[in-house]
């Protein structure tokens, strides 16, 4: 029986129900419910459907003149009636996705303390490190299955936002529900408040976090360890997603815990999965394969290197050697092309550095090899930006790339839109509409020579909700590299351009539910094959996906004894 058709038995009544966002219906309580739960007079007389409520809410939403006010309004609905919030977002997903998440969430994070209204999620501050168990038990969510956690140090392209980073876990979990069908009752956003090195926040009298420079070293590592152990004790089967940790911490944390707990880092692995999925779709649309591409990156942090490693793995799976695959991927950061003789490379960068001997014949060889030098010498067919620095894909670079590649694949992925390496409009005009473009943030369609080009948003929201749904449906104990690779291939299978030869590179957001289910099935199937979950047939896995897919519909309530 569909859970939405089962009555929900509640042990409380009156204003307490109206103050509980997971069960509040507002004006949609039936006459019987109003009597049984002592709600008569607490809500207006008219009994409305959820669609009538959503229509009113949408009119109110459209009355606001700026995106931040719209974001605050939607968050207020979320904090009072979650079912209505998700019905409203479901009805207007393309319009509201940029409001509840990127790019608007970046501004919401910057103004978090100034705009704070109501508690959501958990703040675990370092001075309370000995009471983490108590804090987790304070959560009103008893059956948590997905946690998104941040320490606020690298929020989008905005840097250290302290506890203001809480906007990211809240936004990400909103997408787990609206895109992946994860019940909001099973989600919990958490911010680890370990101080901030942002002087503006430390000096801001309204800042609500711990006013202290960020801790590091052993103190930080021990705090993360205590948190992970406490979560595992409280909710042993939960999936933990690490979000917006600084480069120096992101990869070490992932490496330390990915084999111990069910966890993944969306900035590293989710970004890599959606990028590889988009590249596979672009290659199919261009009539080629990924292992034949030459790839140049601008940005060699943990996210960029995570994408590069996923590309290498996919190339190897298509039949070339690991050494050959790595020779086809060039990483450029602020110091130029990564080379194996550079003294200060991080461990995850070392495996992606090019050999000096292999490039000694290049034109304009120097100690600091620029992106333009790489384009002129390597002649890449794929250009990916994860630098967080706007405007670095210049006209000269893009035109140089197009001069040797008829259909260049160009992905300026930095968020938010103010940080993008080049706008789709510029890229398409510089390449006469020939480039295959995907961006990290939403952009309007571009018209070139009378032809309209839809801009694919290479957004992690196409990947992580499906991964989460697949983990929950299969009961996977870990998130393996093979599961992530399966999510990339499943996303590519949903590309309208790859399937039909026309249309956008990635599916429309209106199709996100079917995309997430398709990805969930691929992820769950690999988990079963790898022995990371109990054996199940394809039919049982698909049924489990449907059973776990929550819909924003009101349930009937019945009263139980108090």
Swiss-Prot record:
Reactions mediated catalytically: (S)-malate + NAD(+) = pyruvate + CO2 + NADH; oxaloacetate + H(+) = pyruvate + CO2
InterPro entries assigned to the protein according to its UniProt record, in alphabetical order: Aminoacid_DH-like_N_sf, Malic_enzyme_CS, Malic_N_dom, Malic_N_dom_sf, Malic_NAD-bd, Malic_OxRdtase, NAD(P)-bd_dom_sf, NAD_malic_enz_proteobac
GO biological process, one term: malate metabolic process
Record keywords, A-Z: Metal-binding, NAD, Oxidoreductase
UniProt keyword annotation of Oxidoreductase present: yes
PANTHER family reported in the protein's UniProt record: MALIC ENZYME-RELATED (PTHR23406), NAD-DEPENDENT MALIC ENZYME, MITOCHONDRIAL (PTHR23406:SF34)
Family membership: Belongs to the malic enzymes family.
Subunit and interaction comment: Homotetramer.
Protein's recorded name: NAD-dependent malic enzyme
Species: Shewanella sp. (strain MR-4)
